[in-house]
Amino acid sequence: VDMQKYDYIKLPANDIFGLLMRKDCPLAQLEKIHPEDIGDYPVFVAHQQLEGNVLSGWLGRDVQSLNMIATFNLITNPALMIEKGLGMAFTFDNLVRIPEESNLCFRPLEPKVEAELYLVWKKFQMFTKPAELFLETVQKNI
């Protein structure tokens, strides 16, 4: 990302990276997922994870060596397929709301992989009044 084109505010929170899976998946019995646990399980991987080296660094090998069944931009579609029993997905913890009655669960990676969170917008952006007020409120409260 060319950050010269954007303004941003670092948010005072991080998100944790892990695997979204069904509760009846054998890996769901683990508290945390280690690279050697992945084996040949079918996984969904976000496009962004293919471009960066965070996931391959955690794995200790190329992401392409995974049994990757598909890539995605938004976790909602893979979440629906995972719910039906088709694989697992590498994702951030807070991207998917998992109700108590859901058959899905999230397990964090170990060693821990965290991401800083940012609010980002184009430089010189013309905002609507509500958007301007929102941004001012965020800036004052962070």
Q: What do these predicted regions represent?
A:
Residues 36, 120-142:
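Extended ligand-binding regions for polar small-molecule ligands
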Residues 22-26, 123-125:
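Short loop segments at secondary-structure junctions
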